[in-house]
Amino acid sequence: MSKSDQLFEQARQTIPGGVNSPVRAFNGVGGTPRFIDHADGAYLYDVDGQAYVDYIGSWGPMLLGHNHPAIKAAVIKAVEKGLSYGAPTEIEVLMAEKVRQIVPSMEQVRMVNSGTEATMSAIRLARGYTGRDKIVKFEGCYHGHADSLLVKAGSGALTLGQPNSPGVPADFAKHTLTCVFNDLDSVCEAFTQYGSEIACIIVEPVAGNMNCIPPVPGFLEGLRAICDEAGALLILDEVMTGFRVSLRGAQGHYNIDPDLTTLGKIIGAGMPVGAFGGKKKVMQHIAPTGPVYQAGTLSGNPVAMAAGLTMLDLLLEPGLYEQLSAKTARVAEGLKAAAAKHGIPLAINYVGGMFGFFFTDEPEVTRYEQVTRCDMERFKRFYHLMLEEGVYLAPSAYEAGFLSLAHGDKEIEHTLAAAERSFAKLAG
């Protein structure tokens, strides 16, 4: 028995399912998870000494690769001054200013500790600002595990086959209207029926929790217009896409001006950080300046802020996102070519530093329902073949993949060679 298997068995005695987030348990692909000892650059190293080229990147934060020396140095310097104060610090001011500099729609910013906190707080603010109760989200999109958002949610909830989680009261769910991603008609229908009651639309501008589904042309622009007409707020959930699909996130890439934005993952450089922000007139409704309550013991933690501020400074390097996009395109197109060589139907989506692949005969995948029709058994086989080759993909057909700037020619060439061998075995 491997050390990973031993640790997993041990973990299941004290941790539900042996993991602290469901997708890590490998239920979506079968088998048992690899326990990680350390990481560096583009690689993960498990407790059994196996190295993997990593395409999860801690589920998105590691845009510069693991164990970046400048970020590590900033964290160590901050730790030496103290771990947490529960009082304002200069670095949280600098962090908020940096976010506003990069993402101009975020005129004011509130720091929190996770993406879930960010989306939960942004929705509460939208309800408080508009005086309305209902929200619109999209089937297959995931915005964290807050009660009002686990309604036909994607990601782990979808993989578990229970899109409505037990423990979510029906009274909460009834205020969440679920529409079809990339289908404006479904949104118009919701607003026709409930428009005066809808506080906001919340959307992943690139849906990264039903694999990777970019918006079709006109979709995000249509949401902006619908919100403007109905007096609702548009919330872009950029927890995943923020600083990943471009420096200004998806809103910069697609030229969309939201009322509120939520951030996570990259903003903390691997530390537990989230943020939400937007138009000053809306953000002024948050306590202590307004009546909408939000608070957090560790919000704006100085160690986490040091990591995040250093990350954002590094992302300002000219040409960085062009490099990242080129790397992603090389991997995505290489996977598609390798599959085609062996007669394996494969659709590919990618934007910026994120990508997704689908075992399907359909030439393009733009809807959640298409994702559910993909060949999940073939994905599971491919996943384990790649894992044996030392390539660490997301252990779920519903999760996006992520590249980092640390992925060089060596890592990409290894990945594509491994993919060709794996596709050959699938076809055999």
Swiss-Prot record:
> Positions modified as N6-(pyridoxal phosphate)lysine?
265
Q: Which reaction does it catalyse?
A: (S)-4-amino-5-oxopentanoate = 5-aminolevulinate
> Which InterPro entries would you find in this protein's record?
4pyrrol_synth_GluAld_NH2Trfase (IPR004639), Aminotrans_3 (IPR005814), Aminotrans_3_PPA_site (IPR049704), PyrdxlP-dep_Trfase (IPR015424), PyrdxlP-dep_Trfase_major (IPR015421), PyrdxlP-dep_Trfase_small (IPR015422)
EC annotation from Swiss-Prot or TrEMBL: 5.4.3.8
SUPFAM superfamilies documented for this protein: PLP-dependent transferases (SSF53383)
Q: Where located?
A: Cytoplasm
Q: What is its main location?
A: cytoplasm
Q: Which pathway, metabolic or otherwise, does it act in?
A: Porphyrin-containing compound metabolism; protoporphyrin-IX biosynthesis; 5-aminolevulinate from L-glutamyl-tRNA(Glu): step 2/2
Which molecular function GO terms apply here?
glutamate-1-semialdehyde 2,1-aminomutase activity; pyridoxal phosphate binding; transaminase activity
Under the cellular component aspect of Gene Ontology, which terms does the record hold? cytoplasm
Q: Which UniProt keywords apply?
A: Cytoplasm, Isomerase, Porphyrin biosynthesis, Pyridoxal phosphate
> Biological process GO annotation list?
protoporphyrinogen IX biosynthetic process
Reported cofactor(s): pyridoxal 5'-phosphate
What top-tier enzyme class does this entry carry? isomerase
- The lineage's top-level taxon is Bacteria
Family, per the entry? Belongs to the class-III pyridoxal-phosphate-dependent aminotransferase family. HemL subfamily.
The record's listing under NCBIfam families reads: hemL, PRK00062.1
Q: How does it assemble?
A: Homodimer.
The name under which this protein is listed is Glutamate-1-semialdehyde 2,1-aminomutase
Q: Which gene encodes it?
A: hemL
